[in-house]
Curated annotation (Swiss-Prot):
PET domain segment(s): 92-199
Statement: the UniProt record of this protein carries the keyword Repeat: yes
Gene3D superfamilies: Cysteine Rich Protein
Name used for this protein in its record: Testin
Natural source organism: Dasypus novemcinctus
Comment, domains: The N-terminal and the C-terminal halves of the protein can associate with each other, thereby hindering interactions with ZYX.
Locations listed in the record: Cytoplasm; Cell junction, Focal adhesion
């Protein structure tokens, strides 16, 4: 398929998750409706990951595509119908022992993902070392956390040009080259083993108590000198604390097998969240999730959340924007050359600010223009004018004067306050 055909085929899948309730806004949201080019709900402005959207098959397709053409093809399977790679995530079902009684159902726990190791006891131990609220037990807070992190850490528009908004053929080609590069140089999947099992991969590795966490040395000479076998001590590359030899450790092949992490320490160095399904990106001695690795390589548009492959883009408010996406967050009108106000780190045009966000003056009860000076006390505001910031009793102008606030009213003196009480 040529580039022109690829560009024409692109779309954002606006029916996906349509009407799903927002877990954050509850009844305030009418249901999920994807914005035309922003990756948010048009109704409540929250992301799709904040909505109760059933996306297990879609997420498996996304991760499957990520692993396509990599050394991790054993983690995917291609559907016979369309050849699309699907992620073969390891689901673990544990049966808890219960007293043998009649009419008692078996107590089972299903993990929506577990490390793909043959030793189920090791996988179970790995799970127990994660914070309880992050253990992906089906139907739990942890399962919701995993789903949210899959969407956040591995956005499909960071790997698939067809999920982006109106890329040019040149941008499509650049993105494909970028994806190929990070698959070859940075992408990896953690491996869970006991620390002692890794001695075969790193036979000359020792950790000296009180020394550097990844100190290496030739053991043979030391043992010949001392004549004693010294027990290896292991420390976590993340928290630097010691690790128990019988506890599972996470290894990252791209980092080298002289580094290991506690399960709960295998996190992105930027957002500090658990690396979902142990999928990591390695760069300059640090672990990253997919999103923050890409952020370290390319500018990201604060409007559409996509990486910017164009040579021309704008910077405003310490953020990057596609030229066509520097728009009002409320009405989508382009803001180039226009007055705007930042509301929750999002640009809003002046008319929308006055209509939807401006505070109301306690004096005249009109919205306060963003360019006009105002007086604010607690949650109350006034125009900083002789017509509005007045004593609620005698109408004396209080600009530059001491005043007594009482439930949205202001007084110039105790006498005036008593007269209004």
């Amino acid at each position: 398929m040529d580039l022109e055909a690829k560009v024409k085929k692109m779309g954002l899948g606006h029916e996906q998750g349509f009407g799903a309730p927002c877990l954050k806004c509850k009844e305030k949201c009418e249901g999920f409706e994807l914005h035309f080019w922003r990756k948010i709900c048009r109704n409540c402005k929250c992301g799709q990951e904040e909505h109760d959207v059933l996306l297990s098959s879609e997420e498996d397709r996304k991760v499957g595509k990520l692993f396509e053409d990599t050394k991790y093809t054993t983690l995917i399977a291609k559907l016979k119908s369309d050849g699309i790679p699907m992620y073969k995530r390891n689901v673990m079902i544990l049966t808890n022992p219960v007293p043998a009684k009649k009419n008692v159902s078996i107590n089972t726990v299903t993990y929506e993902w577990a490390p793909p190791v043959q030793n189920q006891a090791l996988a179970r131990q790995y799970m127990q070392m994660l914070p309880k609220e992050k253990q992906p037990v089906a139907g739990s807070e942890g399962a919701q956390y995993r789903k949210k992190q899959l969407a956040k850490q591995l956005p499909e528009h960071d790997q698939d040009p067809s999920k982006c908004h109106e890329l040019s053929p040149k941008e499509v080609k650049e993105m494909e080259q970028f994806v190929k590069k990070y698959k070859n140089e940075a992408l990896g999947v953690g491996d869970v083993k006991l620390p002692s099992e890794m001695d075969a991969q790193a036979p000359n590795r020792i950790c000296i108590p009180g020394g550097d966490r990844s100190t290496t040395a030739a053991v043979g000479a030391m043992e010949a000198k001392s004549g004693e076998h010294r027990r290896t001590q292991y420390s976590c590359y993340g928290c630097k604390l010691s690790m128990k030899e019988g506890d599972p450790a996470v290894y990252a092949e791209r980092a080298g097998y002289n580094k290991l992490w506690h399960p709960a320490c295998f996190i992105c160095s930027t957002c500090c969240e658990l690396l979902v399904d142990m999928i990591y990106f390695w760069k300059n001695g640090k672990l990253y999730c997919g999103r923050h690795y890409c952020d370290s390589e390319k500018p990201r548009c604060a409007g559409c959340d996509e990486l910017i492959f164009s040579n021309e883009y704008t910077q405003a408010e310490n953020q990057n924007w596609h030229l066509k996406h520097f728009c009002c967050f409320d009405c989508d009108n382009i803001l180039a050359g226009e007055i705007y106000v930042m509301v929750n780190e999002k640009p809003v045009c002046k008319p929308c600010y006055v209509k939807n966000h401006a505070v109301v003056c306690q004096g005249c009860h009109n919205a306060i223009d963003p360019e006009v000076q105002r007086v604010t006390y607690n949650n109350f505001s006034w125009h900083a004018s002789t017509e509005c910031f007045l004593c609620s009793c005698c109408s004396k102008c209080l600009i530059g004067q001491k005043f007594m606030p009482v439930e949205g009213m202001v007084f110039c003196s105790v006498e005036c306050k008593k007269m209004m009480s």
